[in-house]
Amino acid sequence: AGESSTSDQMRQRLAAGAWPPVLVFAEGTTSNGSGILEFRTGAFVAAAPVLAVSLRYASPSGFDLCWTDQASTPRHAMRMLCEPSKVALIALAPLHHPTKAEAAVPSEYAAAVRRTMAKNLPQPPEGLTGRTTRTLWDGWDYAKVRAFWAAENENYERQNAS
């Protein structure tokens, strides 16, 4: 017996009702957060219902912890650890059952779920920003992050002064 494709394995698991449920990041990568990339269709071949979860990160300094821009893992980890506060914004869409047309053409099903997620993408609350169009690490504003960090430390010290 040969190896089955990931799509085949996913279809078998979904048909069996196995627990835990299948979690798929349909973009297959991370981006700068300015939009939703085209979905890979393998996750939609099984034509199973999809609970679309939209995720966006925000922070007062504008640092985007999911956008790595091909930087090294240690450098990205250091930047993430130095960010004093982070917020994960999560939005759940209603369960999407594929239409007959979507079930027959996985790329159409993927596109429909992608459109739903784009409409449902959470927006950062006032005072918090998600990374928008900056795509280079060199564009990261170190001075802004340092100033934010200093202000946070001052607030902490003021609140915890004896």
Where are these regions (language model features)?
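A cross-family acyltransferase "interaction/gating" segment
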Residues: 20-21, 28, 32-108, 119, ...
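Intrinsically disordered, low-complexity terminal tails
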Residues: 143, 147-161
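Short amphipathic alpha-helix with an adjacent loop that forms part of the alpha/beta core around
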Residues: 7-17
